[in-house]
Regions:
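Extreme N-terminal starter segment of soluble prokaryotic enzymes
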Residues: 1-3, 48
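Generic beta-sheet signal
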Residues: 2, 136-148
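Active-site-proximal alpha-helix that buttresses catalytic centers in soluble enzyme cores
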Residues: 9-68
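Short, active-site-adjacent cap segments at secondary-structure transitions
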Residues: 11, 56-58, 81-82, 148-150
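Phosphate-handling substructures
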Residues: 25, 67-126
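Short glycine-rich phosphate-binding loop at a beta-alpha junction
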Residues: 46-53, 74, 139-143
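Active-site signature of alpha/beta-hydrolase-fold catalytic machinery across serine-
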Residues: 63, 151, 155
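Domain-level recognition of soluble alpha/beta enzyme cores
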Residues: 159-181
Length: 186
């Protein structure tokens, strides 16, 4: 079983800012969310815990790892959020009003050909490579980012999340049966 988790809340999440690959820390709320998630996950055995190397995901994974004897968190750059260059740090309101290409990127990133440091197809390739390397006989927690998780589910595994993935939400993925379960911890 693979458990896919979005990092806890950051100050930029609260301000409605695009983070991308900016290394933004968790807020107090995000730390508390991670602690609450750790308690909800404490009875699930994880053989391994992987995380994006960005601090907001890594700190979330570290908090979870305190309840699990896995030997620590394994950072993997392939789990990073998409790099969006000059859009990073700007509010979503600003982007919608002042960056006409942002709407195309947001709604159809696979069609966007603009100037960003990382193309959508490259994100999918690195995610696909990561998941193909996992030992699918193990129970694994993966902590990553909203855009990455959404498109991992949608475009690699053909599962369309109906609503955005919340901070510290965990999605359970049964690799053998290719099924997903949201809100299984609530």
């Amino acid at each position: 079983m693979i458990y896919i988790m979005r990092h806890g809340t950051t100050p930029y999440n609260k301000e409605g800012r695009l983070q991308g690959q900016m290394d933004i820390p968790l807020s107090e709320e995000g730390i508390n969310q991670a602690k609450e998630a750790a308690l909800r996950l404490k009875d699930i055995h994880f053989d391994e815990i992987y995380s994006s190397d960005l601090m907001r995901a890594h700190k979330t994974a570290e908090i979870i790892a305190r309840f699990h004897d896995t030997g620590g968190v394994i950072n993997d750059r392939r789990l990073r959020e998409i790099g969006l260059g000059t859009w990073e740090g700007k509010t979503y309101d600003y982007l919608r009003k002042n960056e006409p290409d942002y709407a195309l990127f947001y709604n159809s990133p696979q069609l966007y050909k603009g100037d960003v440091p990382e193309k959508y197809i490259d994100v999918l390739k690195r995610l696909n490579d990561f998941f193909n390397e996992l030992d699918h006989e193990k129970d694994i927690l993966v902590v990553s980012h909203g855009f990455v998780i959404y498109h991992l589910l949608k475009d690699i595994h053909n599962y369309e999340p109906i609503v955005p993935i919340d901070n510290c939400e965990v999605i359970k993925y049964d690799y053998k049966n290719n099924t997903f379960e949201r809100n299984f911890m609530r």
